[in-house]
Amino acid sequence: MRAIIIGSGAAGLTTASTIRKYNKDMEIVVITKEKEIAYSPCAIPYVIEGAIKSFDDIIMHTPEDYKRERNIDILTETTVIDVDSKNNKIKCVDKDGNEFEMNYDYLVLATGAEPFIPPIEGKDLDGVFKVRTIEDGRAILKYIEENGCKKVAVVGAGAIGLEMAYGLKCRGLDVLVVEMAPQVLPRFLDPDMAEIVQKYLEKEGIKVMLSKPLEKIVGKEKVEAVYVDGKLYDVDMVIMATGVRPNIELAKKAGCKIGKFAIEVNEKMQTSIPNIYAVGDCVEVIDFITGEKTLSPFGTAAVRQGKVAGKNIAGVEAKFYPVLNSAVSKIGDLEIGGTGLTAFSANLKRIPIVIGRAKALTRARYYPGGKEIEIKMIFNEDGKVVGCQIVGGERVAERIDAMSIAIFKKVSAEELANMEFCYAPPVSMVHEPLSLAAEDALKKLSNK
């Protein structure tokens, strides 16, 4: 029996490792276009920043490691160009242009997503970069060093865009962030919470332009400037952080059913073709709160999906649960997290909500080092928590994790307000900020 996994990101490698964990005999082959594998794309901005010393430090395993430790074959710099699902066969081409075919018993599409680059004049000039692979990160640093770059425009104010903006500022560049939406982190935070992040960026010397599309990139061979809102801004390079699109071309060739957003899968991560599975950024999933199809382009979802697919291929029953798209980011000294619905998304879906708020310190007031934290908690009209956003100096991630569990368990405002939390002056307040936000919502619910 042979399982072939196309893609060496978190989803693909987790699938391969999970199959091997539960099946010691199956032949497992991972095929990837990339030269290097098992690295963390989420860490790229932090290498740019200098918080991580080198791109080599974010590579966790080599193909040789996988062969030696797990008996998994990795074919690097190899592209799958066709899938014949009727005959369980794929066609590949290696880095030298040689074509070859392989048969499979199980096929896993872990083809990820591709950066979306808007059709802007000048997008193909030298000095325009995307941020997706370790090679992208290396190319950015090399270009800065070889060209003595002083100014950069970052297009897109999502998490990657802002993390890159801060990282490039730490490298000594003047940074301009350009965002079409009227706020930073438009898919992550409500406008009032996003304003905290924007003010922090501006305090750090990063210029932020909102509700302004990038009109064109100017230069002869290299980037020289950008046009934004009819004005010319001199820059030496442009970072395009304008989102990604699921890579579903091989799924189409295989004849897999494509849903509204990406490859359609069941809870076992099977596609419409039973022996073909799909995992990671190329699949659509179910939103826990609305029950609607959505995308979940996060490493945590990719790993969970890989475990589910791997178990099922190995004969161990497993299922993937609906998502909340819990996420966290760190930009300088600011931590930003969110899970579930925002007030904006709830209003779009016409879900009646009540909002609870709290602003507090992360440690006892008298204990040195406490950081301010601000919480916005979203409840439905039945008083069940359906979303939470937190911005602050520390300990955001663990609170978002706690709220993710609370949403899944359909915890009420009353339960959250009265929940038992731990306390010690160096690490927490006696009044847990999550409970304070729930208390605020509870008062409003009681008055309805």
Curated annotation (Swiss-Prot):
MF annotations from Gene Ontology: NADH dehydrogenase (ubiquinone) activity
Q: What is this protein called?
A: NADH oxidase
| Highest taxon in the source lineage | Archaea
Residues recorded as binding FAD, renumbered to this chain, are 7-11, 42, 80, 110-113, 132, 271-281, 299-300, 423
* Family as reported in the entry's similarity comment: Belongs to the class-III pyridine nucleotide-disulfide oxidoreductase family.
Question: Which cofactor names does the annotation list?
Answer: FAD
Q: Which UniProt keywords apply?
A: FAD, Flavoprotein, NAD, Oxidation, Oxidoreductase, Redox-active center
Report if keyword NADP is assigned.
no
Report whether Cell membrane shows up as a keyword of the record. no
Q: Record-annotated residues binding NAD(+)?
A: 152-167, 179, 243, 328
Active site at 42 (redox-active)
Instruction: Tell me which positions the record assigns to the signal sequence.
Output: none
Cofactor details (free text): Binds 1 FAD per subunit.
EC number of the protein: 1.6.3.4
Functional summary from the UniProt entry? Catalyzes the four-electron reduction of molecular oxygen to water.
Using the UniProt record, name the top-level EC class of this enzyme in a single word: oxidoreductase
